[in-house]
Structures are given as C-alpha cells and as structure tokens.
Amino acid sequence: RGTLVCAVGSTEAQTLTNLEFFKFMRDRFGMQLDIYAWDAGNLDGSGGLYAAQRMDALTKQYPNGYRPIADAAAEIGCRLGVWGGPDGYGDDPKTEAERQELLVSLCRDYHFALFKLDGVCGGLREEKQAKFVETMQKCRKYSPDLIVLNHRLPLGIGEPYATTFLWNGTETYVDVHICNPKTAMHHREFTFTRGNVPGLERLAEDHGVCISSCPEYFEDDLLYQAFGRELILAPEIYGNPWFLRDDELPILASIYSLHRKYRAILVHGMLLPDSYGPNAVSRGDGTRQFLCTGNDSWNMRLVKVKLDAEIGLEKPESGKVSVILHHPYTEFLGTFAYGETVEIQVYPFRAALVECCHAEIAEDMPKDCAYRVIHRQTNGCVDEIE
C-alpha cells in the first residue's frame, strides 16, 4: 500500500486540493497513492470527542458530506481512511446504533480502506468491546480488506480485529517522537539504527515517515521503511509532501513506483549479516532480490555483496547476475557470475538500495551512466530520466 496520513481538522476544499496534488504526482511522475488517511478532527476529535458530539463542526468542514472526497479519490485510484476512537457508542441503544451505522456507512457508502484507532481520540470501555467487534465485522462485509490500526489502545476482545500495532510505540515523527541518538549530518540518522520489527513482522505500523517536521533526507528514511521493514502500509508518509522541493518530488514518486512494481515479491524478507550495514535486509523471490542498507558513520563504507544464497539469491540457469543501484541514484553496475562478490559504496549517513537479479530477467535500462528516474508508466517501466 502506498499511503499518506494527513490533515488535522481539514475541510472539503483543503482535501480536494490535496487530492489534486496527488493527481499531479500521478500524471507527472507516475506515483500512485493507494490510501489517503485523514488525521484526527475529520470524524472524531481529540480527547474523546466523538463525531456525534461535533456534528456542527463536521457539517462546516464537509457541507456535502464525504461523497465529493470519496469520488475525487476514486478518480485517481485512491481510497480514504480516517483517524478516530474505538468507542463513541454512548450509554443508550440509540446512540450505540447510530455510532455503528456511521462507521459501517464509511465502508458501505464510501469504500473506506483504513481506520486508525488512536488513544488521542479516546479509549474503549470494557462494556463496549462486544459492540466494537460487531461493528468491525459489519464494516468488513463492505470493505473486506479494511486495515484497522491500533495506536496504543487496549481493545480487549477487540484486539484480533485490529490489523496492526504501533511498532515500539514510537511514531516516525522526526524531532517530536523520535530523534538521533548521536551527532550526525542530518536529523534522520536514527533510521539506520532503529532496528527491525521482530521476525520481520509486517502487520505493524510506524506512523509513516514524517515530512512536515523534517523534509531533509526523507527518501533514506522511506527506503528503510518500504524496502527494509516493508510494513503493510509501506511506503507510508505523514504530513505535507508539498513541503518538498520541486526536484524532490520525482524522488518521492520513484520510491512509491518502484515499490509498487515489485510489491508482490517484497513481502519475502531476510535479515542480512552485520557486514552488510546496520539493520540491512534483503527482499525478493530468489530470482530478484532488493538489498536495503545504510551507513551510520562519517566515512564512506564499502559493502561486500555476495551474489548467492547469502542474500537470498538462487542460482540462475545462465549463471549470471545483474546488479543495479537504485538509490541514492540509479546505475547499472554490471553483470557478474553467480557467487561473485561485488563492492557497493555507501555514502556517509545515507541509505542504499541495490537490486541483484538473474541476468535474463533484468529490466532494460541505460548503461554506463548514473541517472535519476523522473517518470514511470503504470506498468512500472521507466520512460523519463535525467
């Protein structure tokens, strides 16, 4: 899933403008967003203030309801999600039924893809756990693939109906909820030493790579999230991508598009030896492996990549392996014999993404030059570079 979490207490006009931005990103750079998720204040508010208690505000924010938003999202192949609380069922049967109908209607009428249950919007009373379970069951009749994020909440018997947990209870909100443990060139050094979810579990969430608080080197953080941890919502960003410079927009799009092209095989991951770099991971299907690694030091680092089972690569019939660098720029590094060792240079405090694949299935690409991808077609093929 390519996901964005955005917009605290937004409005219809603001949301339509934001979706227009992602239409531009799709048309200009080939980036496809799967889920656009509203933050708190677009259904439930903070401090246990549920939608039924703030209908006047919601009517002002969305005078036409969610229909124009859902339609605009659908036009660009996207679905909606929203933050909220797990309760809101009140103390009487009428309020309980209205709350359930509200949540079910989001899936039935607007095809919502995501509910984020956050403690900021309130907790779940024990006596309402059964009603929560019933509501989630009814919602999934209309959105069978509904993702329910659990942010720091005890849900009791409702726990199995949540899709994810918040990894380490920490949001990837730079300099707000997470920061560097040591001096570095930029504010995202923590990316390299943060670790991986135990067992490379994918049904977890890290709140998305926050752009609002720190745009610099978002791409390295996003690579570790999307190709390293590869959580269910990856690649996931949080905040305001329009804060990025114009020259950074194709970088964002390229990460989303490359991940989308190979997402079916990226679900298979393995941890690499420490010699490959901090928390390095290899993902793929044996014929094509993507290695995500980084450098958390002030010096250049040479990573020796063994082109064999050490990185999960099966032996090709041809005996040849193609090696492509995808980040921090794109470059065809050559074709080598299976079992050879290739040295990859990783810059200080930067991430690197390397593809190692059977030579016979390597994608056509320019040789003898380094470049940046500007646009990918819907099938993932690159048709514009610089």
Write out the residue ranges for each language-model feature:
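Short, flexible, glycine/charge-rich loop motifs used to bind or transfer phosphoryl groups or to couple energy/partner
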Residues: 26, 105, 279-281
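Composition- and surface-driven signal marking solvent-exposed, interaction-prone regions
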Residues: 128-129, 303-308, 368-369
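C-terminal beta-strand-rich structural cap/linker in extracellular carbohydrate-active enzymes
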Residues: 333-385
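Conserved structural scaffold segments of CAZyme catalytic domains across common CAZy folds
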Residues: 1-87, 97, 239-273, 283, ...
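Active-site-proximal substrate-binding groove within the catalytic cores of carbohydrate-active enzymes
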Residues: 134-331, 341-356
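Aromatic- and carboxylate-enriched substrate-binding clefts and catalytic-loop regions
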Residues: 35-219
